[in-house]
């Protein structure tokens, strides 16, 4: 589990990191179109049995130096970060504070948030569809879309006629939605044959059992017949509804008429 710093303790550490940034870290042109970022991350493994704190400096999407609590000091990621790493590592009091962040910030915040974050689960939504519409026996890409789930641990497997497919798989990798949910696309490259059944199976901690969604390879004529059948049923129901409406309206009109003899 990874938490980005949004609370007061870790945010204070990030603020201190920014204030202590050496001038050498900004040797490039600091015009508005460039972006400097500092990210504090608490990594938890099996609760708080093992906790790792990272302070990452990023310039224009490129990380150039970082503090790693497992290492105990700053290490340069690129040549740009070497002067910064050397500068920070000489600040003894500051380095002691960073090394203590695992206990003073990460573990502290975990205890506060554990009750509502760790047990939280959201079931994934699973859909299967071909990437393009074309006749059978042509190369196609079947897409299994797994969306809006939490936590991020998920396993997606493809089957053809009950046999697992391990070749021809393409995945987008885990995508963060920004609202504590994730999404993932796992695609299968194949040449569908008539009558074949493709199944996407999804396993996730929120599910009591795996979810299986099927896609059946059908010829264009079979699909047209199926759509014609569905259209016929819908049309029949419309005529039936119209007939019942006319019938009950006539019945109501007749019940409202009184016999002529009673008017005299």
Swiss-Prot record:
It comes from Rattus norvegicus (Rat). The chain crosses the membrane at residues 227-248. Pfam families: C1-set, MHC_II_beta. Glycans are attached at residue 46. Disulfide bonds join 42-106, 144-200. It is found in: Membrane. It is a single-pass type I membrane protein. Its main location: membrane. Residues 27-120 are annotated as: Beta-1. It comes from the Eukaryota. This is Rano class II histocompatibility antigen, D-1 beta chain. Residues 121-215 are annotated as: Beta-2.
């Amino acid at each position: 589990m990874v938490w980005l710093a949004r609370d007061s303790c870790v945010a204070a550490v990030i603020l201190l990191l920014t204030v202590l940034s050496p001038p050498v870290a900004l040797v490039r042109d600091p015009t508005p179109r460039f972006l400097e970022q500092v990210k504090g991350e608490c990594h938890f493994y099996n609760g708080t049995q093992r906790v790792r704190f990272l302070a990452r400096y990023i310039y224009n999407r490129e990380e150039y130096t970082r503090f790693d609590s497992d290492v105990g000091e700053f290490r340069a990621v690129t040549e740009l970060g070497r002067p910064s790493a050397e500068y920070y590592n000489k600040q003894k009091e500051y380095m002691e504070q960073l090394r203590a962040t695992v206990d003073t910030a990460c573990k502290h915040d975990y205890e506060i948030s554990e009750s509502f974050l760790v047990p939280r689960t959201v079931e994934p939504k699973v859909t299967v569809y071909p990437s393009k519409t074309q006749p059978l026996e042509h190369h196609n890409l079947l897409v299994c879309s797994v969306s809006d789930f939490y936590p991020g641990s998920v396993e997606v497997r493809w089957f053809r006629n009950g046999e697992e497919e391990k070749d021809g798989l393409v995945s987008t990798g885990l995508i963060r939605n920004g609202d504590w949910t994730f999404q993932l696309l796992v695609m299968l490259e194949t040449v569908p044959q008539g009558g074949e059944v493709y199944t996407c199976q999804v396993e996730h901690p929120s599910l009591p059992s795996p979810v299986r969604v099927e896609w059946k390879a059908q010829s264009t004529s079979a699909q047209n017949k199926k759509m014609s059948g569905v259209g016929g049923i819908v049309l029949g129901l419309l005529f039936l509804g119209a007939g019942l409406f006319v019938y009950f309206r006539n019945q109501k009109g007749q019940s409202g008429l009184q016999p002529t003899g009673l008017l005299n």
